[in-house]
Amino acid sequence: MNFYKIKILILISFIVFSATLESQIVDIETSRKEDLVGTKISLNLGFDGSSGTVDRTNYSIGTRFDFNNEVWNRFLIFNYSRREKDERINEDNTFLHLRFARKISSIIAAEFFIQTNEKPLEKIEERNHIVKGRRHSPIKNLRLGVGLFDENEKRINLDERNTVRANTYLNYLFNISNNTSINT
């Protein structure tokens, strides 16, 4: 069996294995900028609309702040989006994530984050997480993590719910070629 076929077989195995696992409660792996040292700030604004048979208005705002040094990785992400069709709102989402990760060694990091989001059209008035965790990177592109979540959820027309839960995750960045990869 040649090397190309082995890569395809491994890729299919990761996809099947990932589909059978329960997904992370908070998936932020693709948002990490671990190799960045220094400060980076980005701001995204979006607006589009159309008028005619159907009137549509969509707008969004997103910002990200990264403050990293050799020991600490810190970032803040904020997103808001709203979509309307014929004066009816069909999306109105707010998301805020603040994370601190401290490198303990070359393969271990301790993490803390707070996250809040609101999705009133999905009956989520407010969902807040406070999380402490530990992350291991035993080999390049592999991340293993465990976290303890304190979750508070307020749903529209339902009682408020507090939950403490543990979360584990496995994340692997599978490189197919120099400019193509899949994050599982």
Region spans (language model):
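Cleavable N-terminal export/targeting peptides
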Residues: M1-L36
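Short glycine/proline- and aromatic-enriched beta-strand/turn motifs that initiate or cap beta-hairpins
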Residues: I25-N73
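Residues that define the transmembrane beta-barrel architecture of outer-membrane proteins
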Residues: V37-T39, D55-Y59, N90-T94, E126-I130, ...
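Repeated loop/turn-to-beta-strand initiation elements of outer-membrane beta-barrel proteins
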Residues: T39, E70-L76, I107-A110, K140-L144, ...
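Residues on the lipid-exposed face of transmembrane beta-strands in outer-membrane beta-barrel proteins
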Residues: L43-F47, I61-F67, L98-R102, K132-H136, ...
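Membrane-embedded beta-strand positions of outer-membrane beta-barrel proteins
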Residues: L43-L45, L76-F78, F112, K132, ...
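Transmembrane beta-strands of outer-membrane beta-barrel pores
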Residues: F47-S51, F67-N69, Y80-E84, I114-P120, ...
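Outer-membrane beta-barrel transmembrane domain signature
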Residues: R143-T184
